Regions:
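Helical element adjacent to the flavin cofactor pocket in flavoenzyme catalytic cores
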Residues: 138-180, 189-193
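C-terminal catalytic lobe of FAD-dependent flavoproteins
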Residues: 273-276, 282-288, 294-377
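Dinucleotide-binding Rossmann-like beta1-alpha1 core, especially the glycine-rich loop
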Residues: 48-126
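Short hydrophobic core segments
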Residues: 9-11, 174, 182, 189-201, ...
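Beta1/beta-strand and adjacent pyrophosphate-binding region of the FAD-binding site
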Residues: 2-14, 32
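Central helical "cap/lid" subdomain
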Residues: 188-255
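Short beta-strand to alpha-helix junction loop
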Residues: 63-64, 91-100, 139-158, 301-307, ...
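Glycine-rich FAD pyrophosphate-binding loop
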Residues: 25-45
Length: 377
């Protein structure tokens, strides 16, 4: 079989692979994407669809998230993919949660965050989804965006193929990458640059590296309702006070220790399963609820009903929506490194292996792609 060539070959059509394809194609490169499944089916479609800059630490990571946000808006508008540029609310229902939100609202603007503390009445005016009897106040941020990951992962490839001539090879596993050659079951390709965005597949390509990389898999459980009646609109994306302990940006708050201590003492099962609560709304009108976090190399395929019940139970303390009936339940798995925001491995010149963005894949992918392709130029 004859060998073919391309400028930039990308292995994996999840959001990280698509982000690299977009940045490379925009710069005039001939781009070819290889995906072993009929469509992307990993972590990229099994998440909230939240672009969440406020969760990233001040400085390089927040700046990268904002660069990524700019690229997201560019491609969403160009591809005519629906999105909700609504910002977010971290809803506080206890004094410990409010203390963190208020402290971050004081510190955040000096570090570049577009955020403010809202009183109870201001929170209720901003969101129809918050129970008046429950809320103390909320941390407002204007930078968060909601997309439907299923829609995005379907429409971006169509747009890239049509607008930039990006070639997609679906059902096409890559068996090896060596000396800028990509060997598939169909043929061998030669590329100037190869970017491997393998997600949680640590076994197929470069298994020796992954075995000593420190990467783990994180398993999360999520749910989605059907479309809400009468086009009910969530407004800003919602996070509960438990979320303050999850994102690294909030570690600058001294008051976080008291909240962590309260949760450890009063809600230890939420720590055991790494549960915090968030709500996003897809373009279909359905609400996505989650999520939990369990770490290891071999995540179980079996959902725990108690985890879903705990997520819903906590949401019930502050969330009011017209129809909370669950239409879908699933689990997702993403790759994460315990210390690094992501892992980049360069087995040889012109080959980059990138994974391990953890829960920030949607938020950071386009920014990471910019860094990769600047570094490779």
């Amino acid at each position: 079989v004859t060998e073919r060539s391309t400028d930039t070959a990308i292995v994996g059509a999840g959001i990280l692979g698509l982000a690299h394809a977009y940045i490379a194609a925009k710069s005039g490169k001939k781009v070819t994407v290889f995906e072993r499944h009929p469509a992307a089916s990993g972590a990229s479609i099994a998440n909230f669809g939240l672009l969440w800059p406020i969760g990233q630490t001040a400085g390089r990571m927040f700046d990268l998230a904002m660069k990524s946000r700019y690229q997201w808006l560019e491609i969403l508008q160009a591809a005519r993919i629906p999105y909700k540029d609504t910002g977010s609310l971290h809803v506080a229902c206890r004094k410990e949660e409010a203390a963190v939100g208020q402290e971050f609202a004081e510190l955040g603007p000096t570090l570049g965050y577009q955020c403010a503390w809202l009183s109870r009445d201001e929170t209720l005016a901003r969101s129809p989804a918050v129970q008046p009897a429950a809320v103390v106040g909320a941390l407002w941020s204007g930078t968060e965006i909601m997309v439907d990951p299923r829609e995005v992962l379907r429409k971006i490839p169509e747009f890239l193929a049509e607008q930039y001539g990006v070639q997609f090879h679906w059902n096409c596993p890559v068996h090896s990458v060596e000396r800028s050659r990509i060997v598939t079951s169909r043929r061998t390709w030669q590329a100037e640059r190869v970017i491997v965005c393998n997600g949680t597949d640590f076994e197929t390509l470069f298994p020796d590296f992954f075995a000593q990389s420190g990467l783990v898999r994180c398993r999360l459980q999520m749910m989605r309702t059907g479309p809400q009646p009468q086009n009910w609109n969530l407004g800003p994306a919602i996070a509960g006070g438990l979320t303050f302990r999850f994102y690294p940006s909030f570690r600058i708050c001294r008051s976080l220790d008291a909240l962590r201590a309260y949760i450890a003492q009063q809600m230890p099962e939420y720590d055991r399963f790494g549960i915090h609560t968030m709500v996003s709304q897809a373009s279909s009108g359905g609400l996505t609820f989650g999520d939990s976090h369990e770490y290891g190399l071999a995540p179980t395929p079996f959902n725990r009903d108690c985890i879903d019940a705990m997520i819903l139970r906590h949401l019930e303390t502050f969330l009011q929506v017209p129809d909370r009936s669950i239409a879908e339940r699933w689990y997702g798995v993403y790759a994460k490194h315990p210390e690094e925001p992501w892992v980049r491995y360069q087995p040889e010149d012109g080959v980059d292996v990138i994974t391990g963005l953890g829960g920030a894949g949607m938020t950071l992918s386009f920014g990471v792609a910019l860094e990769t392709l600047e570094a490779l130029c």
